[in-house]
Amino acid sequence: MRKREYLIASLAMLLLLVLSGCKGNKLPDGMDEDKVSSAGLAVMSQLTKGEYEEVYDALREDVREQTSADAIEEMMDTATEGRGSFKKVKDSMVTGVTEPHAIAVIGAKYDKKSVVFRIAFDTEMNLIGLDVRGK
Protein backbone atom coordinates (compact mmCIF):
# COMPACT_ATOMS: atom_id res chain seq x y z
CA MET A 1 0.00 0.00 0.00
CA ARG A 2 2.79 2.44 0.87
CA LYS A 3 4.47 1.75 -2.43
CA ARG A 4 1.28 2.70 -4.29
CA GLU A 5 0.90 5.94 -2.26
CA TYR A 6 4.52 6.81 -2.97
CA LEU A 7 3.98 6.18 -6.69
CA ILE A 8 0.84 8.36 -6.79
CA ALA A 9 2.59 11.16 -4.89
CA SER A 10 5.59 10.95 -7.23
CA LEU A 11 3.38 11.09 -10.31
CA ALA A 12 1.46 14.06 -8.89
CA MET A 13 4.73 15.93 -8.25
CA LEU A 14 5.95 15.11 -11.75
CA LEU A 15 2.68 16.31 -13.28
CA LEU A 16 2.85 19.53 -11.25
CA LEU A 17 6.42 20.10 -12.42
CA VAL A 18 5.49 19.51 -16.07
CA LEU A 19 2.43 21.74 -15.93
CA SER A 20 4.28 24.56 -14.20
CA GLY A 21 6.80 24.49 -17.05
CA CYS A 22 3.99 25.09 -19.57
CA LYS A 23 2.94 28.42 -18.12
CA GLY A 24 4.87 31.33 -19.54
CA ASN A 25 6.16 34.27 -17.54
CA LYS A 26 4.49 37.66 -17.72
CA LEU A 27 5.30 39.66 -20.85
CA PRO A 28 7.00 43.06 -20.56
CA ASP A 29 4.63 46.03 -20.38
CA GLY A 30 3.26 46.99 -23.78
CA MET A 31 3.85 43.62 -25.42
CA ASP A 32 0.85 41.73 -26.80
CA GLU A 33 0.83 37.92 -26.64
CA ASP A 34 -1.06 37.54 -29.94
CA LYS A 35 1.37 39.82 -31.79
CA VAL A 36 4.40 37.96 -30.43
CA SER A 37 2.82 34.62 -31.32
CA SER A 38 1.91 35.73 -34.87
CA ALA A 39 5.34 37.23 -35.47
CA GLY A 40 7.02 34.08 -34.14
CA LEU A 41 4.93 31.85 -36.39
CA ALA A 42 5.78 34.06 -39.38
CA VAL A 43 9.52 33.75 -38.69
CA MET A 44 9.17 29.99 -38.16
CA SER A 45 7.38 29.75 -41.52
CA GLN A 46 10.23 31.59 -43.24
CA LEU A 47 12.77 29.28 -41.62
CA THR A 48 10.92 26.13 -42.67
CA LYS A 49 10.76 27.45 -46.25
CA GLY A 50 14.50 28.13 -46.32
CA GLU A 51 14.13 31.93 -46.41
CA TYR A 52 17.28 32.50 -44.35
CA GLU A 53 18.27 35.81 -45.97
CA GLU A 54 14.83 37.24 -45.18
CA VAL A 55 15.08 36.15 -41.55
CA TYR A 56 18.60 37.55 -41.34
CA ASP A 57 17.41 40.87 -42.79
CA ALA A 58 14.61 41.00 -40.19
CA LEU A 59 17.04 40.80 -37.26
CA ARG A 60 17.65 44.00 -35.32
CA GLU A 61 20.83 45.64 -36.61
CA ASP A 62 23.01 44.95 -33.55
CA VAL A 63 21.99 41.29 -33.62
CA ARG A 64 22.55 41.06 -37.38
CA GLU A 65 26.17 42.13 -36.83
CA GLN A 66 26.73 39.02 -34.71
CA THR A 67 25.49 36.38 -37.16
CA SER A 68 24.88 35.61 -40.83
CA ALA A 69 22.26 34.03 -43.06
CA ASP A 70 24.65 31.08 -43.43
CA ALA A 71 24.76 30.63 -39.64
CA ILE A 72 20.96 30.64 -39.52
CA GLU A 73 20.86 28.03 -42.29
CA GLU A 74 23.43 25.90 -40.44
CA MET A 75 21.36 26.09 -37.24
CA MET A 76 18.26 24.92 -39.15
CA ASP A 77 20.17 22.12 -40.89
CA THR A 78 21.51 20.88 -37.55
CA ALA A 79 18.11 21.05 -35.84
CA THR A 80 16.20 19.33 -38.64
CA GLU A 81 18.79 16.78 -39.76
CA GLY A 82 17.20 13.36 -40.13
CA ARG A 83 13.74 14.63 -39.20
CA GLY A 84 12.23 14.82 -42.67
CA SER A 85 9.97 17.62 -43.86
CA PHE A 86 8.00 20.14 -41.83
CA LYS A 87 4.39 18.98 -41.37
CA LYS A 88 2.58 21.30 -38.94
CA VAL A 89 2.73 23.38 -35.78
CA LYS A 90 2.01 21.14 -32.78
CA ASP A 91 1.79 23.80 -30.10
CA SER A 92 2.97 27.27 -29.22
CA MET A 93 3.20 29.63 -26.29
CA VAL A 94 4.62 33.04 -25.50
CA THR A 95 6.69 33.82 -22.44
CA GLY A 96 8.43 36.81 -20.96
CA VAL A 97 11.89 36.71 -19.43
CA THR A 98 13.81 38.90 -17.00
CA GLU A 99 15.14 40.98 -19.88
CA PRO A 100 12.64 43.29 -21.59
CA HIS A 101 11.69 40.92 -24.39
CA ALA A 102 9.31 38.07 -25.18
CA ILE A 103 9.88 34.66 -26.70
CA ALA A 104 7.52 32.69 -28.93
CA VAL A 105 8.11 28.98 -28.27
CA ILE A 106 6.77 26.82 -31.08
CA GLY A 107 6.73 23.04 -31.29
CA ALA A 108 6.76 21.84 -34.89
CA LYS A 109 6.06 18.34 -36.18
CA TYR A 110 8.34 16.98 -38.89
CA ASP A 111 8.06 13.60 -40.66
CA LYS A 112 10.08 11.73 -38.04
CA LYS A 113 10.64 13.92 -34.97
CA SER A 114 9.73 17.31 -33.57
CA VAL A 115 11.65 20.58 -33.57
CA VAL A 116 11.33 23.45 -31.08
CA PHE A 117 11.66 27.04 -32.28
CA ARG A 118 12.37 29.83 -29.78
CA ILE A 119 12.03 33.24 -31.42
CA ALA A 120 12.69 36.40 -29.39
CA PHE A 121 11.40 39.92 -29.90
CA ASP A 122 12.19 43.15 -28.09
CA THR A 123 9.47 45.48 -26.81
CA GLU A 124 9.29 47.18 -30.22
CA MET A 125 8.73 43.77 -31.88
CA ASN A 126 12.18 43.70 -33.49
CA LEU A 127 13.51 40.18 -34.02
CA ILE A 128 16.41 39.78 -31.59
CA GLY A 129 17.06 36.06 -31.31
CA LEU A 130 16.56 32.59 -32.73
CA ASP A 131 17.10 29.16 -31.28
CA VAL A 132 16.04 26.04 -33.16
CA ARG A 133 16.67 22.57 -31.75
CA GLY A 134 15.56 19.06 -32.35
CA LYS A 135 13.37 17.71 -29.59
Language model regions located:
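Hydrophobic helical h-region of N-terminal Sec-dependent signal peptides
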Residues: 10-16
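C-terminal motif of bacterial Sec signal peptides marking the signal peptidase cleavage site
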Residues: 18-21
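Short solvent-exposed beta->alpha transition segments
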Residues: 53-100
